[in-house]
Design a protein with these regions (language model features):
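DNA/chromatin major-groove-contacting recognition/catalytic segments
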Residues: 3-5, 102, 127-131
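Generic alpha-helical structural context detector
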Residues: 28-29, 69, 123
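Active-site micro-motifs of SAM-dependent methyltransferase domains
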Residues: 25, 97, 127-130
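Conserved tyrosine-mediated DNA breakage-rejoining catalytic core shared by Y-recombinases
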Residues: 1-42
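Short, basic (Lys/Arg/His-rich) helix/loop patches that form interaction surfaces
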Residues: 17, 33-42, 46-49, 54-111, ...
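Catalytic-site neighborhood detector that most strongly recognizes the C-terminal catalytic loop/helix
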Residues: 113-131
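Ser/Thr-centric signal marking residues that sit
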Residues: 8-11, 87, 94, 108, ...
Length: 131
């Protein structure tokens, strides 16, 4: 498998995302508890990836899709009320929807989601209107 770090689709896709102290601490724990590797993988001059696969390479979208499928399958084998298909992109939609519903400023949400057009944030992701 060849690893390539691609640019974002739009310039607004490259952004700094604020995080709380709790989120920062969570990322620190992930890094501290991550399996120690002999050589840190470097892809296109970038290193410090949070999650590595069994070959000590960065986890990619396909890894996460499979991971989510496994979780849903295991959950559904245990519980009567079935969990619908969940993907990382569904989590993105859910985040956007919940932030909109909680009253986050639409322009702030647009920035966080990396949308160049506020219409994408308002129509595609939120499924609710701002009053």
């Amino acid at each position: 498998m060849e690893y390539v770090i691609e640019n974002t689709k739009t310039t607004s896709g490259t952004r700094e995302i604020p995080m709380s102290d709790e989120v920062y601490a969570c990322f620190q724990r992930i890094i501290e508890n991550r399996k120690k590797v002999k050589t840190e993988p470097m892809i296109d001059g970038k290193c410090g990836f949070l999650y590595l696969d069994k070959n000590d390479m960065p986890m990619v979208a396909l890894h996460w899709e499979k991971y989510f499928q496994h979780i849903c399958k295991k959950y559904n084998s245990i519980y009567k009320v079935q969990m619908p298909k969940v993907t990382p992109h569904v989590c993105r939609h859910t985040f956007c929807f919940n932030m909109a519903k909680s009253g986050m400023n639409p322009k702030t949400l647009q920035y966080l989601m990396g949308h160049s057009d506020i219409g994408v944030t308002m129509n595609t992701y939120t499924h609710i209107g701002y009053d």
